Amino acid sequence: MELKVINQQGQAVESLQAAETLFGREYNEALVHQVVTAYLANARAGNRAQKDRSEINKSTKKPFRQKGTGRARAGRASSPLWRGGGKVFPNSPDENFSHKVNRKMFRAGMAAILSELLRSDRLVIIDDIKVDSPKTKEFAAKAKALGLENALVITGELDENLYLSSRNLSNVLVIEASQADPYSLVRFDKVVVTRDAVKQFEEQWA
């Protein structure tokens, strides 16, 4: 299939032959949801922690005698029933949040996302995008001219000037093709991909 390629001024300059399997796939919402949630789950650090009753720093002495007080019996102050006591099922930093997605499903999910972006006019193919110096003002002007208010920019290889000039913009993210992930693709309003990045996508996922 043919993709329209624009230049940095937003003008159509040529067409690019691209794989139908990558940009012409039907949208599979369940698969895309699975791929995105698996990516987010695998990115979790797993650093939350709570204490159980054995880890609470309280006396192990019985708070009061077993009978004769009229109160419910109690064994120790670290009981989960008491304020300040341990959790019954505490969260652990060793908890495993990872979801397994095999390579075939991941490739199909990425292709479904790219195809849907193209159908909904959210995917822009550009011949190349560069800035002369690492200045946010220069990149912001270029992004505004291309209508990129909330955009993911994917290049074949990361240009240092482009990266440095864009990292101060909260609504724009510049990455190289090898760093592309399903969450970033669905998160932004526009996805700008260079010709070189398209070729890399075809090698990885087509």
Curated annotation (Swiss-Prot):
Keyword flag rRNA-binding: yes
Where along the chain is composition biased (Basic residues)? 59-74
Alphabetical list of PANTHER family matching this protein: 50S RIBOSOMAL PROTEIN L4, LARGE RIBOSOMAL SUBUNIT PROTEIN UL4M
Q: How does it assemble?
A: Part of the 50S ribosomal subunit.
**One CC-aspect GO term:** ribosome
Q: Which InterPro entries does the protein's record reference?
A: Ribosomal_uL4, Ribosomal_uL4-like, Ribosomal_uL4_dom_sf
Q: What is the recorded name of this protein?
A: Large ribosomal subunit protein uL4
Compositional bias (Basic and acidic residues): 49-58
Alphabetical UniProt keywords: Ribonucleoprotein, Ribosomal protein, RNA-binding, rRNA-binding
Q: Which Pfam families match?
A: Ribosomal_L4 (PF00573)
Q: Its family? A: Belongs to the universal ribosomal protein uL4 family.
